[in-house]
């Protein structure tokens, strides 16, 4: 997993870090878990949600195939289970909320995407939440495929809601987002990021951030979908 090791090792820009913190805070509020509750995260990335949950006095466990990521979570004080998803090597009804940020789109097809949702539903306690955040193919266009080579399952608001129903979950909300933004502002910023000339922006940023850093920030601000469902 050399690509993802390098991806996580590369520093975020100041703007990128601020946007990510704001986005994580917004997702954290959607979890609806009180201090002392338990959160399970699929694909913890750089550990931002792990850190936020532990700071709030919650129990936290992550599942990831990357040993480097699992080690980071343990250093933060959380639990980590190394393995591919799905299935999820977690007990039935063991979490008050299950969170998957930028994970569903990495499933190879709709059957694996459905299996992932079914597994998240299994791990959530009765009345618990499943919170999913994924890019919107309709807004990202070719950038959905270009941003990461492992993107396999096209995610849209409609498709995520359909899987949610088939997994036996009750949708609570399915809102468009762009980084930490929502509503009309998310739509406007997402559209601007899609249409802004990438080469021009990279040239203007030359000497301050790399073209790759700009591209990551740009794709992070394209329209995405934040789905909240209950078991």
Where are these regions (language model features)?
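Conserved N-terminal segment of class I S-adenosyl-L-methionine
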Residues: 1-87, 91, 97-101, 117, ...
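Short alpha-helix
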Residues: 152-168
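Feature marks short, surface-exposed loop/turn motifs that line or immediately flank catalytic pockets
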Residues: 69, 138-140, 178-180
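A short glycine-rich, Lys/Arg-flanked "PGG" loop and its adjoining helix->strand segment in the class I
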Residues: 114-129
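Short, glycine-/aromatic-enriched active-site segment of Class I SAM-dependent methyltransferases
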Residues: 131-152
């Amino acid at each position: 997993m050399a690509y993802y090791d390098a991806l996580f090792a590369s520093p975020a820009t100041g703007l990128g870090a601020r946007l990510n913190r704001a986005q994580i805070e917004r997702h954290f509020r959607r979890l609806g878990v009180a201090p002392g509750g338990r959160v399970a995260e699929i694909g913890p990335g750089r550990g931002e949600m792990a850190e936020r949950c532990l700071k709030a006095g919650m129990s936290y466990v992550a599942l990831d195939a990357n040993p480097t990521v699992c080690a980071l979570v343990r250093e933060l004080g959380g639990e980590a289970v190394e393995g591919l998803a799905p299935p999820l090597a977690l007990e039935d009804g063991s979490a008050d909320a299950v969170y998957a940020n930028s994970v569903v789109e990495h499933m190879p097809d709709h059957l694996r995407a459905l299996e992932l949702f079914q597994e998240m539903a299994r791990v959530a306690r009765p009345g618990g939440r499943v919170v999913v955040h994924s890019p919107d193919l309709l807004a990202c266009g070719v950038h959905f495929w270009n941003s990461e080579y492992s993107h396999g399952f096209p995610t849209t608001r409609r498709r995520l809601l359909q899987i949610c129903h088939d997994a036996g979950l009750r949708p609570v909300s399915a809102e468009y987002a762009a980084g930490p933004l929502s509503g009309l502002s998310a739509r406007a910023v997402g559209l601007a990021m899609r249409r802004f000339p990438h080469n021009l922006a990279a040239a203007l940023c030359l000497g301050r951030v790399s073209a790759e850093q700009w591209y990551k920030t740009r794709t992070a601000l394209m329209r995405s979908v934040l789905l909240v469902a209950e078991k």
